[in-house]
Amino acid sequence: MVDLETKNRILKAGEELFSLKGYDATSIQEICEKAEVSKGAFFHYFPTKESFFLEILDLWLKDLTSRINEYVKNAQNIYDSLLKMTELFKEIFKESRPKFLLFIEFLRAGIRDENILKKLSEYFELYTNYFAQIIAEGIQKGIIKPVDPKVTAHVIVSYAIGTIEQEIFKPDNQMEEISREGIKLILESIKKED
């Protein structure tokens, strides 16, 4: 039987420690101490440190995907759905610096670990395809100029990742506004003239 409270406590402790110390510098023992569980409890839920890290990554990216879907669902049309996602930047920037550091830690760990890189690549491909589909639909409906949907989606995803990284290296209140204005600039460049 899975005790969700215990499992969530372990996940929260790991997320905090990974964002503070990094993947390599965080031990399973430290995670267990912070979560106030035994190593046996840890291994009951997660067979390895890597599988634990991947579950944190998966939960984080599923939450992000859910929020993106919510913005798209509540928009009036394809172009507005993309534009409305600028509000997501505001939410992301309010989530705090530890989330940004955790994101960078996922990227860093992915460089050295093939399984983590594979999981990151799957999500980046998912997001790219998702945005490409929205853009293709916008082109078909005459809302967006005839651009290459896949290339445009890559630009949007790359911009989002770059903006998150900039917030880590230059944390100030301006990044939220710069992010929204930047995505608007990208979207205005593909909007079909009336």
Please name every model-derived segment:
Residues 93-117, 168-169:
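Amphipathic alpha-helical segments used for helix-helix packing
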Residues 1-5, 194:
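N-terminal intrinsically disordered/low-complexity leader segments
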Residues 55, 69-97, 152-156, 176-180:
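Hydrophobic alpha-helical connector segments
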Residues 95-98, 114-140, 150-154:
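Amphipathic alpha-helical packing segments from all-alpha helical-bundle domains
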Residues 9, 13, 17-51, 55:
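Helix-turn-helix
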Residues 85-91, 129-137, 159, 165, ...:
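C-terminal peripheral helix-coil segments that are non-catalytic and often amphipathic
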Residues 58-63:
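Short, basic, alpha-helical segments at the C-terminal edge of helix-turn-helix-like DNA-binding modules
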